[in-house]
Structure formats: structure tokens, C-alpha cells
């Protein structure tokens, strides 16, 4: 799976991993031990209301994550407003990191199950997201990259709330977020970085967990987000229906 799409593309996603790793003040770091389900320590009940937030509270605001809006992708003015907000949230240095044109190279299209699987395998074959610390900034860079290179409307990247493993709400996206333990040595080595990833991702997460991307091929046929958090998916779909009715 993903072979045909790999033959069609040769370069664009090959640099994505390096662009994410070069995000300002952020390096790969070293992880301690194996990633386990819900293995890292939590700061407690921060963000308990994450899964129950209202439709109005699901705007993609700077400094927030896992709250990509559910909306009608056919509304052109809303797409443009969303794209402008995304661009406003990314500074000039991010533009250099993304390294793509301002306008998408192909017509805009919504993420589909098949497209999500193809993109997941393509990114994996080109170096992947495996083990890269998650942060709100890298979330936006990935959104922008796929929008500009593949024309994918950036309303698809959303994950279940914590604590523990965060499963993608887009069925077919094979990259989940897993809590990891960061070694003391890694923290010592990167202390001189103003915003090293183990610190930034921790504060991006309302549960205070350090998260990293992990490829999981079983997500192609098991909709874990819905199986484990049906109320979150239903709330998101309700917001989507509301926006369709208002539009």
C-alpha cells in the first residue's frame, strides 16, 4: 500500500522530516525506554474539558492543538479565512521551514480515507514522523505542507483528548501520538535551547505529557478514535452539521 503514490512523487515529502526537526529551537532528542500505552506521568486533570468543548471553542487558535475545526470544506470564504489564520500563526521562519509556495500547487481537496492512507505510507517511506516530538507548531507545519504540496484542506488533523495515546480522528491517518519519557541526559544536553521539543510539547498538551508521532498500520482497519471516544467523534460531527446548516 502506498507504492503507487510513492512512484508518482519523488522529492516533496522527503524533506518534511528535516523541516519538522529544524523547527526553531527544537531537536530530535533521545527517548528513554520503550513507548508504552499511557506510560508517562500526567500533571493531573488539566484540560478535562477538552472533549466537551463547544463548537464555538473549536477554532484553530495559536498555542492550542488537537482542535482543528470541523466545518464544511466547500465554503470557499471559510477556507480562505482558515488559511489566513494559519498563515498568521506561522512566522517568517516557519515559511522557510515549510519551503513551499504560498498557493497550493494542486486544486484544494478534502482528506479522504484512501488519501489519508496513501499520505501516511508516503510520509513513512520518506523518513516519516516516527519519534518526532509533537508540538502545536509542528502540527501547523504538517498542515501547511500537505495543503501546499497536495492541496489537502487543513481540517483533517485532529486527535482524541488525553491522557495517554491520542488517536487520529481522521480514519485512515496512520500516525498516532504516544506519551514518551524523556531521559535526564537529553534534557541536560538540550537545556541551552530556549524551546527544546520536550519542553514545548509538554506545555502544548493540557495533560502535561510529552508526545511523539508513531506509525500504526492497524489504524487502517480499526477506527480506534471512534471505538474508544465515541462521544468526541459525535460532538465533532454535531459541530460539522451545525456549520453546514448555518452555511
UniProtKB/Swiss-Prot annotation:
Region feature (Mediates dimerization): 140-153
Region (Disordered): 31-54
Disulfide-linked positions: none
Molecular function terms from GO: GTP binding
Subcellular location: Host cell membrane
Lipidation (N-myristoyl glycine): 2
Subunit text: Homodimer. Interacts with host CD247/TCRZ; this interaction induces down-regulation of cell surface TCR/CD3 complexes.
Other remarks on this protein: This is a macaque isolate.
Protein name (database record): Protein Nef
Natural source organism: Simian immunodeficiency virus (isolate Mm251) (SIV-mac)
Amino acid at each position: 500500500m502506498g507504492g503507487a503514490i510513492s512512484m508518482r512523487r519523488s522529492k516533496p515529502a522527503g524533506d518534511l522530516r528535516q523541516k519538522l526537526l529544524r523547527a526553531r529551537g527544537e531537536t530530535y532528542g533521545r527517548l528513554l525506554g520503550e513507548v508504552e500505552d499511557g506510560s508517562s506521568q500526567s500533571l493531573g486533570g488539566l484540560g478535562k474539558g477538552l472533549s466537551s468543548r463547544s463548537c464555538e471553542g473549536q477554532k484553530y487558535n495559536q498555542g492550542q492543538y488537537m482542535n482543528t475545526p470541523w466545518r464544511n470544506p466547500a465554503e470557499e470564504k471559510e477556507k480562505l479565512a482558515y488559511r489566513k489564520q494559519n498563515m498568521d500563526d506561522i512566522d517568517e521562519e516557519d515559511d522557510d521551514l515549510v519551503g513551499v509556495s504560498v498557493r497550493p500547487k494542486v486544486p484544494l481537496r478534502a482528506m479522504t480515507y484512501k488519501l489519508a492512507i496513501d499520505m501516511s505510507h508516503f510520509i513513512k517511506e520518506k523518513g516519516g514522523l516516527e519519534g518526532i516530538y509533537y508540538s502545536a507548531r509542528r502540527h501547523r507545519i504538517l498542515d501547511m505542507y500537505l495543503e501546499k504540496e497536495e492541496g489537502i484542506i487543513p481540517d483533517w488533523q485532529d486527535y482524541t483528548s488525553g491522557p495517554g495515546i491520542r488517536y487520529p480522528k481522521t480514519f485512515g491517518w496512520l500516525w498516532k501520538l504516544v506519551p514518551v519519557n524523556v531521559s535526564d541526559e537529553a534534557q541536560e544536553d538540550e537545556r541551552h535551547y530556549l524551546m527544546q521539543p520536550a519542553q514545548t510539547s509538554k506545555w502544548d498538551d493540557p495533560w502535561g505529557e510529552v508526545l511523539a508521532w508513531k506509525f500504526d498500520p492497524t489504524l487502517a482497519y480499526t477506527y480506534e478514535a471512534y471505538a474508544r471516544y465515541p462521544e468526541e467523534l459525535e460532538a465533532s460531527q454535531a459541530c460539522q452539521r451545525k456549520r453546514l446548516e448555518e452555511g
